Amino acid sequence: NNPNNPTGKIYSEEEIKGLAEILRENNSKTGRITYLICDEPYRAIVYDGAKVAPAFQFYENTVIVSSFAKDLSLPGERIGYVSVNPKSDNPDEFIKAVTFALRVLGCVNAPAFFQKVIAKSWDAKVDYSSYKTRRDKLMAVLDKAGIQYHRPEGAFYLFCKVPENFNGDDGDFCFHLKKHLILA
């Protein structure tokens, strides 16, 4: 996914191009199409001028999965979409397969009312600045505590390294935090 959950890393254009080349080589070698499925619900939540590379431009057999709930900052509203690159080898077949899978797996569609809300909100401008403010505050607290982390370039996650004195055991670290009512 891009930006990545849980690290907030944004994969660069070069990384996406490299992955596309590997997939093309695999397609040639196997005679089968491998799809690049990009889970991008956080693509609009980016920091410090970062941008999410447009995978459609680099690999024809790309599918984008995203979420209006994240795009429009509507937490809890489970409404999203799948977009198939029109340049892919067989976009209609892929769409049929996804539609079939949704029916067979019993996925529930978003209520009609909310589908209309999304249609009317398509061009809404969302202020994501609160995510950056929270990220920066949390990084300052972690810096002060001496806890290492991957600096998130996007999304609203911050992935920390378990402190040395816990020997890399995240379970022990979480239990320690819970004892001090830091983590529920």
Describe every region a protein language model picked out.
Residues N1-A184:
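PLP-dependent class I/II
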